[in-house]
Amino acid sequence: MSCWAKVTKFDPRSAALADRHYSRRKVGSPQFMPPGQTLILLSDGEAAVFGWWRPDPKSGIKAMNGLDGWTCTIFRNESLAYVSSAMILEAEQMLRAEGYDIGPDGFITYVWDKKVNSANPGYCFKLAGYKTRGRSADGKKTLLIKPYP
């Protein structure tokens, strides 16, 4: 049984968690995901949110980083009940279960090193199998990728 349930990008419980995430652009906004294909997951204890995003392949729009895969745009875990790396793996399973094409670049995320309180930024993603693949265009974030088999 998964710790996650699907919700929409307008889910107020998820938006409240997003308000406390370092990537939040506008605190209090009713939504927190970019346009395109999304899968938003809320933990069963409502203490964690995970958001997958990909430009809709039918739109012709490409991701600014040139990668073709699903990007975790937000992951906030305030839960003590679940290990973050296990939650990431379950979020990947949920995405596959939806039947989406994962894309040749697999699973993608960025971690803003200076905004996380960790000596090893992205550690939970690394435990879930992600590897460092460079930096964001502005140089502020570490790019982590996990190929999809």
Predicted segments with their positions:
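Non-catalytic substrate-recognition and accessory regions of acyl/acetyltransferase enzymes
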Residues: 1-115, 119, 123-149
